[in-house]
């Protein structure tokens, strides 16, 4: 009984001590939001730093996969504080997730815990995980804690910023509506993207999410000319490697090996936490990438923020949640799914200073859009581009579903009357064609009325004209990539809906850019048949 009383007194003392510096922590966070803090070394490589000698020291009590329990003698570190320990000569960062009883905290490891032993010392850094920010990050690949992983040496900056930030105040946010032209016909016509908005690319495995996101980087980053940040969250390491070299080939980034180790002139920073990383890294790497994007935005830049894949962020959260002992909700996801998603998505916003335009690939498990992970993402997006397996099976790429995809920008007050009318006509024709497909499959085309036969012919041409050769797929298709201006896209589909190209064969519209190319291809095909 006496023991219980003394332990509760100790707990009360700890709580008092803990509550006192909270305002100080808040000030430090707001200070880092306003600007950035200086760090004595460009990159935190070593676990033997001066502040750690004076910091609170704990010992490891338990290791369960990616979760590590650490016991402290004195006051406990704050929630979200970064702890550091040495793991076989490497610096291991642990993030405080829970306060348990008996002066113990439960932490999530940002790297493998293989090699940790009970009784090992752990140091409280007194701050949250911070990553380097600023122009020095452009052209570099970093991991979740901001360490460079591209073998080009340390990142030459002293500016760092905590990965946990508050979303901007309502009065700071910008509400202007402007279209971001991508050069991809199906996107620009039927589900246009918003500059400074959030876009989701939904699709199952192997329907082309990553190829589409790479084409968007190629088209927008080149035309846009501003800075981009790419966060690779739990995806294939091979794709991350390919993207790095493709960015160098397309001159979005500068190869440091050809430039005396410098990446000056690069336009994109890359932050990777790939499939082989522990769940802690995959659950935080999106925040690390977003922090770099926010820093550019606060300096007055219009930033592009690409995430591949948001589902892996949710998946990592579910793994961590289970290890932390939380009771899972529907389909095994974490009970805090909506909160975790909201905390990330609300930070991706435009302010009066600058903008963040976000493009997020979202894997759809078993092609089920009602799954809680993709369904939770829908609420936060300005535009959704749904990739369909049935369209991919027809060989039409990008395999964007023109009827399931949606954008709040498709409004006559934003895009103009002509664009809106043409988009509605295209969707009406495709919807009618979809409703007739069962009749065609059972009875054949001959049983349709003349009007329906004409409509089906136009719908099939529209379907093929929605395909487009990509720059990033040139090596596989052998067709040069096409970037189509919005005016050309509207002109082409307007003519197709009006029946101006009824005399041309369907094949003329497959994998071409503008309508003029389709007309030329059609004439060539007709000439070949007649000869």
Curated annotation (Swiss-Prot):
Q: Which HAMAP family match?
A: ATP_synth_beta_bact
The membrane topology noted for this protein in its Swiss-Prot or TrEMBL record is: Peripheral membrane protein
According to the UniProt entry, where is the signal peptide? none
Q: What is this protein called?
A: ATP synthase subunit beta
Which is a Gene Ontology cellular component entry for this protein? proton-transporting ATP synthase complex
Question: In which organism is this protein found?
Answer: Bartonella henselae (strain ATCC 49882 / DSM 28221 / CCUG 30454 / Houston 1)
Instruction: Read off the CDD domains from this record.
Output: ATP-synt_F1_beta_C (cd18110), ATP-synt_F1_beta_N (cd18115), F1-ATPase_beta_CD (cd01133)
The taxonomy runs: Bacteria, Pseudomonadati, Pseudomonadota, Alphaproteobacteria, Hyphomicrobiales
Per its UniProt entry, what is the enzyme's top EC class, as one word?
translocase
């Amino acid at each position: 009984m006496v023991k219980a009383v003394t332990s509760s007194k100790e707990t009360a003392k700890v709580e008092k001590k803990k509550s006192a510096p909270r305002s100080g922590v808040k000030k430090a966070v707001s200070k880092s939001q306003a600007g950035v803090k200086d760090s004595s070394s460009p990159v935190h490589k070593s676990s033997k730093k001066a502040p750690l000698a004076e910091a609170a020291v704990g010992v490891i009590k338990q290791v369960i996969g990616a979760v590590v329990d650490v016991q402290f003698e004195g006051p406990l570190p704050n929630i979200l504080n970064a702890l550091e320990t040495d793991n076989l000569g490497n610096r291991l960062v642990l993030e405080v997730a829970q306060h348990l009883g008996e002066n113990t905290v439960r932490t999530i490891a940002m790297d493998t815990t293989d090699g940790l032993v009970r009784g090992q010392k752990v140091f409280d850094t007194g701050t949250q995980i911070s990553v380097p920010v600023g122009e020095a990050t452009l052209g570099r690949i970093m991991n979740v804690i901001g360490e460079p992983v591209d073998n080009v040496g340390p990142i030459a900056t002293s500016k760092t910023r905590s990965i946990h930030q508050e979303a901007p105040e309502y009065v700071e946010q910008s509400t202007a509506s402007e279209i971001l032209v991508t050069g991809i016909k199906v996107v620009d016509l039927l589900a246009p993207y918003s500059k400074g908005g959030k876009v989701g690319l939904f699709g199952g495995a192997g329907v082309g999410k990553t190829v589409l996101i790479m084409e968007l980087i190629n088209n927008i980053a080149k035309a846009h000319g501003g800075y981009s940040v790419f966060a690779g969250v739990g995806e294939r390491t091979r794709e991350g490697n390919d993207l790095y070299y493709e960015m160098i080939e397309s001159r979005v980034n500068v190869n440091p090996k050809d430039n005396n180790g410098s990446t000056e002139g690069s336009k994109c920073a890359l932050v990777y936490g790939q499939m082989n990383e522990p769940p802690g890294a995959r659950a935080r790497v999106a925040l690390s990438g977003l922090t770099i994007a926010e820093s550019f935005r606060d300096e007055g830049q219009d930033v592009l923020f690409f995430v591949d894949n948001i589902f892996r962020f949710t998946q990592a959260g579910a793994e961590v949640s289970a290890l932390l002992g939380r009771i899972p909700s529907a389909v095994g996801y974490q009970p805090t799914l909506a909160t975790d998603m909201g905390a990330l998505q609300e930070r991706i916003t435009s302010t009066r200073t600058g903008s963040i335009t976000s493009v997020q690939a979202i894997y759809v498990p078993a092609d089920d859009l009602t799954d809680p992970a993709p369904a939770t993402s829908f609420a936060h997006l300005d535009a959704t581009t749904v990739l369909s397996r049935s369209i991919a099976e027809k060989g039409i790429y990008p395999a964007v579903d023109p009827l399931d995809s949606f954008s709040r920008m498709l409004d006559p007050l934003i895009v103009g009357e002509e664009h809106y009318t043409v988009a509605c006509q295209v969707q009406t024709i495709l919807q009618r064609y979809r409703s007739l497909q069962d009749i065609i499959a059972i009875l054949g085309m001959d049983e349709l009325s003349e009007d329906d036969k004409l409509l089906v012919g136009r719908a099939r041409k529209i379907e093929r004209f929605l395909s487009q050769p990509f720059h990033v797929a040139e090596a596989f298709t052998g067709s040069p990539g096409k970037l189509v201006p919005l005016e050309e896209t509207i002109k082409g589909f307007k003519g197709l809906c009006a029946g101006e190209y009824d005399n041309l064969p369907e094949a003329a519209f497959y994998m071409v850019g503008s309508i003029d190319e389709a007309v030329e291809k059609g004439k060539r095909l007709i000439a070949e048949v007649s000869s």
